[in-house]
Amino acid sequence: MWFLNSVNLLFLVCSVALHLDAVNAWSPTNGYAPGVVDCDENINLVRKADAVSDDEADWLKVRHESTVPALKDFLQRGFKGFTNDTSIIDKLLATQDTAPKVAIACSGGGYRAMLSGAGMISAMDNRTDGANDHGLGGLLQSSTYLAGLSGGNWLVGTLAYNNWTSVQAIINNMTDDNSIWDISNSIVNPGGINIFSSISRWDDISDAVEEKKKAGFNTSITDVWGRALSYNFFPSLDEGGVGYTWNTLRDVDVFKNGEMPFPISVAVGRYPGTQVVNLNATVFEFNPFEMGSWDYTLHTFTDVRYAGTNVTNGTPNVTGKCVAGFDNTGFVMGTSSSLFNQFLLQLNTTDLPSFLYNLLHGFLTDASDDYDDISIWAPNPFYEITNIPSNYSQSISEDDTLYLVDGGEDGQNIPLTPLLQTEREIDVIFALDNSADTDQSWPDGFSLTQTYARQFGLQGKGIAFPYVPDVNTFTNLGLNTRPTFFGCDARNLTDLESIPPLVVYMPNTRESFNSNTSTFKMSYSTSERFKMIQNGFEAVTMKNLTKDENFMGCISCAILRRKQESLNYTLPSECDACFEKYCWNGTVDATTPISSTTSSSASSTSTSDSGNKENSARILAPRSTLSLLIGGLASVFISF
């Protein structure tokens, strides 16, 4: 309860200022529409995905200057009272080359994932009151990468693009009007009883999207969705950052100085009209420098600043002229969560006043056409690229339009793929799972099984992922109710293409609040937001370290494990007990669980949105989750 009590005691006014360069921060039109800008006459905007970009490599050198001392401090605190043998910390943290590289992945799951994930992240942030004493404070400061998908990307994007604000700062201001994550009212009816406020909001959104359309760019419902979301994430900016661009972050001091992790947003490639999204779909990432994919169906990145430029194999069709402003921050965040476009399309199930319904229905129908859950990136920045191997489909490069969808539509609801690239040399990934896999909307490890299976398919070239059990085993062994380590012994992973990072799986589970809310619950009271965040904090800390006082020490062992193995160093003997307790030991129980709930509580009041997903009883069982998604969407009813 300490976390909520600290929230009740703190009513400090903490402004979240955006230190942005006026030229670089916005679209050249100062609005939502992209515009033409001058660029180098010899510029080529694409590169082969055979390494991290030069910009990322340069940034990593700066970031490591912050992560190494932060990680050393974290590990020393973790070992205090846990072991007297701290020699390995000094050995590994002596240089940047031997220091473990940490990444965090935030799953999708709507506002549930955003809020529960916020609690999880806050437990790792030394800026959170009590995180150093009752949580994993400093782990966020020790991390190099922070990936988000759908609702998890709302969390990552909010923090990153509000000048790396903290969850604590958001909480401190949560009772203020127009604060970050002020979602007391639905996104469709943001004004609540003030219907004129809602009309004004949607009128502004309509005008913004129309500006993009008049500028000659295709629009879809994702433009509407992204614009609507932005008001909740960037309330201090004009019209929710109507001209705020994704690439802006590269020019912001807190990022340039390496004071925050490298943010990554994830989406998946798909064509409109198709109903197949499986593990062979192309996984796209957006970072402050680039957008593109490591997958061999693309294997290319492009400068995200100039997305929207007509190109052929990366060369602008008009010499010396590029387009800027297409990479609107809300549009990128909307692309990663485009599944929620269906929410806007269900207006006939709402209790909106007729005149607001008519306004929205006409606007959204015109905007959506046949692209219900698709984000349109046109012109295609990868048109006629030549980096795709001949034995892979060339379809992405052959179309003049790039179609992207919600990053979780391929079943990989935790954005792990960008973090598994050997070029990034990550040693440990903290996988925060706020999925709604079971009938009661708790996670059951399904996302991990999909990522594991993907490495053996067409798109698995170049990646490796630790062995994981089937989803029934996750539930039967309770692996989805507590933190679990996967890939603890590199000697058992030699059959894989490479030695993958150790994965620390941290699922949403009930500690003090029923956090298994519906993915499509689109409004949360202030009290609900506080409780969701508090429960998330408790879920990743073994309830504020009360269930295991050595938990931080065990997390420290997990962080050190890969580097210790590769350099043949010795961990403290106390780590053996940690691995015995938290590592999955290969036991499988694939029988159908008696109950599919993962809550530690005997009851739940959540609305299910998991559909009729049939849990696989095999480790290797890739399959599409589109039927699940459609089934869930068909029963969506919006209430205000």
From Swiss-Prot:
Keyword tags: Glycoprotein, Hydrolase, Lipid degradation, Lipid metabolism, Secreted, Signal
A Gene Ontology cellular-component term: cytosol
Signal peptide positions (record): 1-25
Protein family: Belongs to the lysophospholipase family.
EC annotation from Swiss-Prot or TrEMBL: 3.1.1.5
Subcellular location: Secreted
Organism domain of life: Eukaryota
Residue ranges with Low complexity bias: 594-610
Protein name (database record): Lysophospholipase
A Gene Ontology biological process term: glycerophospholipid catabolic process
SUPFAM superfamilies reported in the protein's UniProt record: FabD/lysophospholipase-like
Principal subcellular localisation of the protein: secreted
Purpose of the protein: Catalyzes the release of fatty acids from lysophospholipids. At acidic pH the enzyme hydrolyzes all phospholipid substrates without metal ion. On the other hand, at alkaline pH the enzyme shows substrate specificity for phosphatidylcholine and lysophosphatidylcholine and requires Ca(2+), Fe(3+), or Al(3+) for the activity.
pH-activity note: Optimum pH is 2.0 and 7.5.
Catalytic activity as recorded in UniProt: a 1-acyl-sn-glycero-3-phosphocholine + H2O = sn-glycerol 3-phosphocholine + a fatty acid + H(+)
Post-translational changes noted in the entry: Highly glycosylated.
GO function terms (MF aspect): lysophospholipase activity; phospholipase A2 activity
EC class of the enzyme, as a word: hydrolase
Residues carrying sugar: 84, 126, 163, 173, 218, 280, 310, 317, 348, 391, 492, 516, 544, 568, 585
Region entry Disordered, spans: 594-616
